Amino acid sequence: MDPFLIKLIGFAAATCTTVAYAPQFIKVLKTRSARDISLGMFLVMVLGLALWLIYGLLSGDAPLIASNAVTMLLAGGILVMKLRYG
């Protein structure tokens, strides 16, 4: 398969999974309520994203690096708001 197409698919997948966190982030930011969000899920998710980011950095995989860096910021922000707002 064409390497450009492979990268394009990677960036498209990365964009979809990253953008998926934005509505939740915005909702918690606006309502100042994270009561119904699972703390355990976001703790594990942020850890997993950090590990994927490290893997992407070590392997030089641009889609992994970009998507996991941004997603980790969004998920980490939700985690911080969960701890702050409950």
Swiss-Prot record:
Q: Which residues cross the membrane?
A: 3-23, 37-57, 61-81
Has keyword Membrane? yes
Q: How does it sit in the membrane?
A: Multi-pass membrane protein
> Mind telling me which InterPro entries this protein's record contains?
PQ-loop_rpt, SemiSWEET
Write one Gene Ontology MF term: sugar transmembrane transporter activity
Predominant localisation class: membrane
Going by the UniProt record, its keywords in alphabetical order are: Cell membrane, Membrane, Sugar transport, Transmembrane, Transmembrane helix, Transport
Asked if Transmembrane is a keyword of the record, the answer is yes
The record's GO CC annotations read: plasma membrane
Cellular location(s): Cell membrane
Which Pfam families does the entry link to? Answer: PQ-loop (PF04193)
Q: What does this protein do?
A: Mediates sucrose transmembrane transport down a concentration gradient.
Q: How does it assemble?
A: Homodimer. Homooligomer.
What name has this protein been given in UniProt?
Answer: Sugar transporter SemiSWEET
State the species of origin.
Bradyrhizobium diazoefficiens (strain JCM 10833 / BCRC 13528 / IAM 13628 / NBRC 14792 / USDA 110)
